[in-house]
Amino acid sequence: MEILQSRYRISAKQEFGDEMLSTLPPSTVFMAVGRKEIYFWVLLQGNAVHFDKKYLEKDAAEYLNWLKEQAYHQIGVRSPVECEDRSLDAIRDKKSSTVQPPESSQSPCEDKYAALRKLYDQIIRPIAHVLRERNIIIVPDGPLCLAPFPALFDSDSEKFLFESYRIRVAPSLSCLKMITHPSAAYKGTKDALLVGNPAVEDIKVGGITLVPLPCAEEEVEAIGKILKTKPLIGKSATKEEVLSRLNAVALIHIAAHGCMEAGEIFLTPNPDRPFKEPEKEDYLLTMADLAGVQLQARLVVLSCCHSGRGEVKAEGVVGIARSFLGAGARSVLVSLWAINDKAAMEFMMSFYQHLVEGKSASEALNKAREHLRLSKDFCEEKHWAPFVLIGDDVHLEL
């Protein structure tokens, strides 16, 4: 929070009352999980606030965690995925970081959308009647943090939530205010930085030598053609070169190995390093590095840190996104879980094509989701639901 405050020149002593609410868009939703209740505050037109409460006859956090896990399993998120392993969390932790469902006496859900329907009924239906804007911003709490909001299913309309709304997520209301009102020091820029498949063959983590990521390279090359930008690939994607460009671009896309929990991205070791064996500071892009950079980026896309092991890494996603937001980025696009490499490529091509056509990040995201949902090969929820836009909605002049 201190980083965010310094970047956006907001005093830590500032009070967030009516003045704060006046700066936030309508249909901003704050959710809080109590012992047996879920509390909702929805910002309306004219600074009005709608308050509501959903009472549950059980421990709210445990039940919501159970529902979330059921949803993941029912749509196939927990199944192995055919994709490049860009995550080093399991190596760092010396164990698999796959999340296990909490114990519950609840009987298994019966149909594919059962948990998605129940999640909708618990956290959207109580406030659906006051969500009158197409764009909604959700500030979740506890077990609701980065639930699969786009795939929540309304049994009445037979629609997924993303079909009715363009959804963004914010780590906190104060964070959202800082991001949506950047300082006067912000300078417009139209350039893009695309980083893919850094040369990491000299790097060992936990005794394991990192391997190349050809799909990551293919990804940024294809995006580069859409944006008419030459990407940094292989040996050119050094930490020194990336750091020198970070603060001068409007768009950052990184497809590389990463450690989500530590907030680290692995780049090509600087060639002029003093020792043959690269040290961490030669190749690791860390949260501390980002804290020292004044980013001008309107959008950061992180296509890294995922594996095919059926993991959902909500806390890590928030952490690394906060680092980029704290360094000055306006918004960050991340994925909660890994998807098939071909599906990821299809998604990215659609997303960037809509961006260059002038659509906002949230609209381009929805269009890309819809593109996959209507496709023959990637129509299942596990392919289009993981992508989350954290922070502001932005337009890019590319």
Where are the language model's segments positioned?
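Catalytic cores of enzymes
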Residues: 12-69, 75-398
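Short, charge-rich amphipathic alpha-helical segments embedded
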Residues: 1-7
